């Protein structure tokens, strides 16, 4: 300014001094504004915090003594916002109104007050669940009644200390103690500040169910279908356990086949602690029925060794359902269950026997069902397939591989010993319980076509007859050759299928005897050991006895015996002759009639001369295209079987050809080659003619 004054008259000095005055004024104004703003913010902060505190205190005071959890009831606090907005008339207001009355006072207190309210405010905002305030033991049960709510000192510090006392019981340790030692008066004495855990779900408090928000049980559990496990203890738990400690509702959707009203969660949730005790939860096994009906690999089958579910699985596989379906299996989803690799293991699993061995109504029904014979029995008879009885198929593995190729995969193992992966070749005596799997859709189609015809032999007549469930009469086999019925673990397990046999197997044309697998008796006098020659049909009793016969005879160990060594001494098909035509199976055609060599591609079946009893493994039904290659590979070693790959891969059950010729590398390649076509045009022709009939 001295320089400016020297430079000019007063106007110069004025102009020089003006900017300074302006800047000073501006600075002063800004300072004032900042102070006022700060003071205003402080006041608003105080008001807001005290209002929240007072509101919370009032809520806590009016709230029922059973405060249900460690999270605040956000719904109620939200609905009470109007109260937050409305002015609070209390000693706090009067003391505060006199406190901030002028700018000067604000400015004087500014440095101190700008910090303290924030500090206090954050003190209760920051209290995390594990802060010391939370971890302190809960106050005595009568504290709520002894506290003088109306006489708050004007000092705000005490007010801000209240939240810690209120929130104290929200800590985990306090939860544990209050859960384990509930006192009727004070289960959860006070609410937590909404700012701390605003995510509390509305309507969860036991003491007060907010009408706007349904309780968790109503939301998550359908009252009609699922029992609420904690319903019975609601009265006790409402006063003793914070709802937050309960499992709100683990909604496990039951499989459609499962009774819906079985409680999914056991009521034993009272084990204390803020985490639910999951040890007692029984989750239902994975859906035995695939959600996608076209799905071929059954999740339940995936556990080869968990045979406990096997009968369950079998039921879902349609053994109970599909078997009863009638001529047409409507079980698209039932594609060859055998295709699952794990099935093999389960087959070899002795326990399987137990689960399957008991003739459960389902199994029996499925076996006995007439439709079964065609599709399930029929697709293939393993060397000793006891096709004779559909129920037998139960004993036998009747994999629903409608394509013979499918069965052939099973059959494919010439050396039977290897046929089941699980069965060590000749000596593992694992009783194979029959695994009767329904045929897939292809089977259904086929069975529909065939059943009317009485199983016109779709494959070579013999095969078809087998397919049709024509029982192989093993009784004709010399006893050493004859397969004993499956070694059911307990003789009692014998399937009482005889009654069913007539139904299922005996088609009009079929003598009941043909339905039976004569494992029980020696060769019937009339029967010849070779299937090629017709023999008089035995009494239907055959079926009965063979079926009822304890399956104890069959052992997996015998599979080896399936090695098809002597063609002549092989299995004999029970029916007088399986005529190639539908009659072959006793279909419409006459039962008698020597079999066409075509039928079994010859004595190949007979090759299965089994020196010992062997399980009947019947693969029936469509194997889905995915029929397990492992099974095919396992069976591929059996010297007598050749499966056309087309059937194997494509699931063209009728198209597959079961040939008893030794399987060479080419045969193995065929098995793995999805594109392989049936090599024999004659066979194709017979298939076509079958369809035309």
Swiss-Prot record:
The modification Phosphoserine is found at residues 70, 86, 90, 136, 171, 274, 306, 368, 393, 433, 456, 489-490, 492, 613, 623-624. Its main location: cytoplasm. Residues 1-20, 447-468, 498-507 have a biased composition (Polar residues). Changing residue 171 to A: Loss of cAMP- and calcium-regulated phosphorylation. Greatly reduced interaction with 14-3-3 proteins. Impaired phosphorylation under low glucose conditions and impaired interaction with 14-3-3 proteins. Residues 331-378, 386-415, 509-529 have a biased composition (Low complexity). Keywords: Acetylation, Activator, Cytoplasm, Host-virus interaction, Isopeptide bond, Methylation, Nucleus, Phosphoprotein, Transcription, Transcription regulation, Ubl conjugation. The record marks 629 as: Required for ubiquitination and degradation. The modification Phosphothreonine is found at residues 169, 192, 501. The keyword Glycosyltransferase does not apply. InterPro entries: TORC (IPR024786), TORC_C (IPR024785), TORC_M (IPR024784), TORC_N (IPR024783). Changing residue 368 to A: Reduced cAMP- and calcium-regulated phosphorylation. There is a cross-link at residue 234 (Glycyl lysine isopeptide (Lys-Gly) (interchain with G-Cter in SUMO2)). The modification Asymmetric dimethylarginine is found at residues 51, 99, 120, 123, 161, 168. Phosphorylation/dephosphorylation states of Ser-171 are required for regulating transduction of CREB activity. CRTCs/TORCs are inactive when phosphorylated, and active when dephosphorylated at this site. This primary site of phosphorylation, is regulated by cAMP and calcium levels and is dependent on the phosphorylation of SIKs (SIK1 and SIK2) by LKB1. Following adenylyl cyclase activation, dephosphorylated at Ser-171 by PPP3CA/calcineurin A resulting in CRTC2 dissociation from 14-3-3 proteins and PPP3CA. It is found in: Cytoplasm; Nucleus. The modification N-acetylalanine is found at residue 2. Changing residue 70 to A: No effect on cAMP- and calcium-regulated phosphorylation. GO terms for biological process: cellular response to cAMP; gluconeogenesis; glucose homeostasis; positive regulation of CREB transcription factor activity; positive regulation of transcription by RNA polymerase II; protein homotetramerization. GO terms for molecular function: cAMP response element binding protein binding; transcription coactivator activity. Binds, as a tetramer, through its N-terminal region, with the bZIP domain of CREB1. 'Arg-314' in the bZIP domain of CREB1 is essential for this interaction. Interaction, via its C-terminal, with TAF4, enhances recruitment of TAF4 to CREB1. Interacts with SIK2. Interacts with 14-3-3 proteins, YWHAB and YWHAG. Interacts (probably when phosphorylated at Ser-171) with YWHAE. Interacts with calmodulin-dependent catalytic subunit PPP3CA/calcineurin A. Interaction with COP1 mediates nuclear export and degradation of CRTC2. PANTHER family: CREB-REGULATED TRANSCRIPTION COACTIVATOR (PTHR13589), CREB-REGULATED TRANSCRIPTION COACTIVATOR 2 (PTHR13589:SF6). Transcriptional coactivator for CREB1 which activates transcription through both consensus and variant cAMP response element (CRE) sites. Acts as a coactivator, in the SIK/TORC signaling pathway, being active when dephosphorylated and acts independently of CREB1 'Ser-133' phosphorylation. Enhances the interaction of CREB1 with TAF4. Regulates gluconeogenesis as a component of the LKB1/AMPK/TORC2 signaling pathway. Regulates the expression of specific genes such as the steroidogenic gene, StAR. Potent coactivator of PPARGC1A and inducer of mitochondrial biogenesis in muscle cells. Belongs to the TORC family. This is CREB-regulated transcription coactivator 2. It comes from Homo sapiens (Human).
């Amino acid at each position: 300014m001295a320089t400016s004054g020297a430079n000019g008259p007063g106007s110069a000095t004025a102009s020089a001094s003006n900017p300074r005055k302006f800047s000073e004024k501006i600075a002063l104004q800004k300072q004032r504004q900042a102070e006022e703003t700060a003071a205003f913010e402080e006041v608003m902060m105080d008001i807001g915090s005290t209002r929240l505190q007072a509101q919370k205190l009032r809520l806590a005071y009016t709230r029922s003594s059973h405060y249900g959890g460690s999270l605040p009831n956000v719904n109620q606090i939200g609905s009470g916002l109007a109260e937050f907005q409305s002015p609070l008339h209390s000693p706090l207001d009067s003391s505060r109104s006199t406190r901030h009355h002028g700018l000067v006072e604000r400015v004087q207190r500014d440095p101190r007050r700008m910090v303290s309210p924030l500090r206090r405010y954050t003190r209760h905002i920051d209290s995390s669940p594990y802060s010391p305030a939370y971890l302190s033991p809960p106050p005595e049960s009568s504290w709520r009644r002894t506290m003088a709510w109306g006489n708050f000192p004007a000092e705000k510090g005490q007010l801000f200390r209240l939240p810690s006392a209120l929130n104290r019981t929200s800590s985990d340790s306090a939860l544990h103690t209050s859960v384990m030692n509930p006192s009727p008066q004070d289960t959860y004495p006070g609410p937590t500040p909404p700012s701390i855990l605003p995510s509390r779900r509305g309507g969860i408090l036991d003491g007060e169910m907010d009408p706007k928000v349904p309780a968790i049980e109503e939301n998550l559990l359908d009252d009609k279908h699922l029992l609420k496990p904690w319903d019975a203890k609601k009265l006790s738990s409402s006063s003793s356990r914070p709802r937050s400690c309960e499992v709100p509702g683990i909604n496990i959707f039951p499989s459609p086949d499962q009774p819906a009203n079985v409680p999914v969660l056991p009521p034993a949730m009272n084990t204390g602690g803020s985490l639910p005790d999951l040890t007692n939860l029984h989750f239902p096994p994975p859906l035995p029925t695939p959600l996608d009906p076209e799905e071929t690999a059954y999740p339940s089958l995936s556990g080869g060794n968990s045979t406990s579910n096997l009968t369950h699985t079998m039921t879902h596989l349609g053994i109970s359902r599909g078997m009863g379906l009638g001529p047409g299996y409507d079980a698209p989803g039932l594609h060859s269950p055998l295709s699952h690799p794990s099935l093999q293991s389960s087959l070899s699993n002795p326990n399987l026997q137990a689960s399957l061995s008991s003739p459960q109504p389902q199994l029996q029904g499925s076996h006995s069902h007439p439709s079964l014979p065609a599709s399930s029995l029929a697709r293939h008879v393993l060397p000793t397939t006891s096709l004779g009885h559909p129920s037998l198929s139960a004993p036998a593995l009747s994999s629903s591989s409608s394509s013979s190729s499918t069965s052939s995969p099973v059959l494919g193992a010439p050396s039977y010993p290897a046929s089941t992966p699980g069965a060590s070749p000749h000596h593992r005596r694992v009783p194979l319980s029959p695994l009767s799997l329904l045929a897939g859709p292809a089977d259904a189609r086929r069975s529909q076509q065939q059943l009317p015809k009485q199983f016109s032999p779709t494959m070579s007549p013999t095969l078809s007859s087998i397919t049709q469930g024509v029982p192989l009469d093993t009784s004709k086999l010399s006893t050493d050759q004859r397969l004993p019925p499956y070694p059911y673990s307990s003789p009692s397990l014998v399937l009482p299928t005889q009654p069913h046999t007539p139904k299922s197997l005996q088609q009009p044309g079929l003598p009941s005897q043909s339905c039976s697998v004569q494992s029980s008796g020696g060769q019937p006098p009339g029967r010849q050991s070779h299937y090629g020659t017709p023999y008089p049909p035995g009494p239907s009793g055959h079926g009965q006895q063979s079926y009822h016969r304890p399956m104890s005879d069959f052992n997996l160990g015998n599979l080896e015996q399936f090695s098809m060594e002597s063609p002549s001494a092989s299995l004999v098909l029970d029916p007088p002759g399986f005529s190639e035509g539908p009659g072959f199976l006793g279909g419409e055609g006459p039962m008698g009639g020597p079999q066409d060599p075509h039928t079994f591609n010859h004595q190949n079946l007979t090759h299965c001369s089994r020196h010992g009893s062997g399980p009947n493994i019947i693969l029936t039904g469509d194997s889905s295209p995915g029929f397990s290659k492992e099974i095919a590979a396992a069976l591929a070693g059996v010297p007598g079987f050749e499966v056309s790959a087309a059937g194997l891969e494509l699931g063209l059950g009728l198209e597959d050809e079961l040939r008893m010729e030794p399987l060479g590398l080419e045969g193995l390649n065929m098995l793995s080659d999805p594109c392989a076509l049936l090599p024999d045009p004659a066979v194709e022709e017979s298939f076509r003619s079958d369809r035309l009939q």
